[in-house]
Swiss-Prot record:
UniProt keyword annotation of RNA-binding present: no
UniProt lineage: Bacteria, Pseudomonadati, Pseudomonadota, Alphaproteobacteria, Hyphomicrobiales
Name this protein carries in UniProt: Leu/Ile/Val-binding protein homolog 4
UniProt organism field: Brucella melitensis biotype 1 (strain ATCC 23456 / CCUG 17765 / NCTC 10094 / 16M)
One Pfam assignment: Peripla_BP_6
Family: Belongs to the leucine-binding protein family.
Known function: Component of an amino-acid transport system.
Length: 416
């Protein structure tokens, strides 16, 4: 089944569940996907959409919630905070008790604040926000609150594991350079890379923050990196800022390895080709990392959606697996859904995903799960973007090993 057909079928099923639940005595659980479904960043939003439909479909196949199918509502946030704010209002007006989103930390910052303020004004009718992929540290730091949960990594998790994995393999070296986009995510990455240097055992000899998606020629930046004589380049860059940086590095003959967070974004390997070989990424999934369990998940995901899970999809699926496990321990009171009870259940839930143990830290609502450090290689079983390259895992960290400490800036007020 193609992704397009799968998505259309998912929307049709959601519409049918809306009609079928109309006469039910129990209040239906409505989950609103508020994602970037159009415009230049829609490719990532559609990946989240596929993951949500896949896993909520699994939950519905198993009986849904309280004997009713979970209803899936969709809203296009058009890639920006303003659009997201409008769509969150519409979703709540349509009866959604839970908002899910993941493709932008800027959008996530808007949604989490809107949800927080709404909940302050509407005691007893609180809305949950399940963050599937927005990784800015502040979301579980200064902006943390009881009704927000993050199911993805953050800068601290990604760059601690990628550095330690490379160190353990003997490919990190001693001299490192940090180059990142100049906004909250890039600053988070730079701060993490600097903070980890002494403990893991490398020196950050220089660092650069640059404009986001405006630079066409990274040659001057690469010349600076080359002059620094480094072994590893840490970068949280994504999209063209990653591709153009790596192409400029290859053209200049730079020998340093790139330690990245988003090298697995669809299209990257197809565009970079041999340039990407040997470079590193740390993510929550690799189909070869956990034997039959991880490969079986990859094959089932492809069977349902038409493509292997990649980039943001696995983390979203695994987070919603935890959510589904939590729902098993929640019983609606007098036919009404209590989102506070659902939040408490998520805090106490644990599940075995295709990658291993997955749980939620109650202090700040940062999920805890394994991370896989992997390199671009021809030896990978599953290839990326129709090329001869894929991602070959060489180090897996448990959730306990991966997770970062609770940030001092998180002061979560609990209900009651």
């Amino acid at each position: 089944m193609s992704l397009k057909v799968f998505l259309q079928a998912g929307v049709a099923c959601a519409a049918l569940s809306l009609a079928g639940a109309a006469g039910a005595s129990a209040e239906p659980l409505k989950i609103a996907l508020v994602e970037t479904l159009s415009g230049p960043q829609a490719s990532t939003g559609l990946l989240y959409r596929a993951a949500v439909l896949y896993q909520l479909g699994k939950i519905n196949e198993a009986g849904g919630f309280n004997g009713e199918k979970i209803q899936i509502l969709e809203y296009d946030n058009q890639g920006g905070p303003v659009g997201a704010a409008d769509r969150v209002k519409a979703a709540i007006a349509d009866g959604a008790q839970i908002i899910v989103q993941g493709s932008s930390s800027a959008v996530a910052g808007q949604i989490t604040e809107d949800v927080r303020k709404y909940n302050l004004r509407n005691k007893g009718k609180e809305v949950l926000y399940l963050n599937l992929g927005a990784e800015a540290l502040e979301l579980t730091g200064s902006k943390c609150h009881f009704y927000h949960f993050r199911f993805s990594p953050n800068a601290a998790i990604r760059f601690k594991t990628v550095a330690q994995g490379m160190k353990d393999k003997g490919i990190l070296g001693e001299r490192a350079y940090s180059i990142n986009q100049n906004y909250s995510w890039g600053v988070d990455v730079e701060n993490t890379v600097v903070a980890n240097a002494k403990e893991i055992g490398y020196e950050v000899v220089d660092k650069t923050l640059h404009e986001v998606n405006k630079i066409q020629d990274f040659s001057p930046y690469v010349a600076k990196i080359q002059a620094a004589n480094v072994d590893t380049v840490f970068t949280g860059n994504w999209s063209n800022d990653l591709l153009l940086l790596m192409k400029a590095a290859s053209g200049a003959g730079l020998k340093a390895k790139f330690a990245t967070s988003f090298l697995d974004q669809p299209g990257n390997i197809g565009n970079a080709g041999a340039i990407a070989e040997g470079h590193i990424v740390s993510t929550p999934f690799n189909p070869e990392a956990n034997g039959e369990a991880s490969m079986a998940f990859a094959e089932d995901y492809k069977k349902v959606t038409g493509h292997y899970p990649s980039y943001a999809e696995p983390a979203a699926v695994f987070g919603l697996q935890l959510f589904g496990e939590a729902l098993k321990n929640v019983k609606p009171g007098e036919g009404k859904i209590n989102t506070t009870d659902i939040a408490l259940a998520i805090e106490n839930a644990s599940v075995k995903t295709p990658m291993g143990d997955y749980s939620m830290r109650s202090d700040d609502h940062q999920a805890k799960f394994p991370m896989v450090v992997q390199e671009v290689s021809k030896k990978a079983r599953i290839k990326a973007d129709g090329t001869e390259y894929g991602f070959l895992p060489f180090k897996t960290f448990t959730g306990d090993e991966s997770i970062d400490p609770v940030q001092e800036s998180c002061s979560m007020k609990r209900p009651g």
